[in-house]
Amino acid sequence: YIVLQKTPNIRFHLPNCSNIGKRDTDKYTDLIGVHTDREFGHHPEELNIIFPITNMFDTNSIYYENSPNSNQNLYDFQSLKLNENNFSINNFNQCLHYNKINKTNITRVSLDFRIIPYSKFFIENKSSVSNNIKFQLGDYYILI
């Protein structure tokens, strides 16, 4: 069994915009929303799946560290490069990631959702920061 985020996130990363907001903790103005998903209460075993509808590359994509707590310079993070209809599984729950202003002329559209192997799932009394849905089966997650 797999625990699946019930409602996927649909991302639109428009030219000359970021698809996430700046945070007070951002050290640099051009690196926007530096965070791990765990900071927002997500389950420690959660994995991110990104399924692009359009090609993801350069500044219309996500920048991420190679491994958790890498102490990697933020400017050395890689851009996630994916062709449409491919997908990527990432540990953005533990790895820092951020956006930049999209300087390409391509709007990135992607479906982003989270999974947890059922064998690693346990109940935490936490809720989504953005919509206050509990990170529990039947609320934020479904079992497939």
Question: Can you say where each PLM-predicted feature lies in the sequence?
Answer:
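Intrinsically disordered, low-complexity acidic/polar segments
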Residues: 19, 58-60, 120-122
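Residue-level detector of short, conserved catalytic/binding motifs and their immediate flanks
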Residues: 8, 47, 109
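Signature of the catalytic double-stranded beta-helix
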Residues: 1-35, 42
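Short, solvent-exposed loop/turn segments at secondary-structure junctions
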Residues: 10, 15-17, 39, 54-56, ...
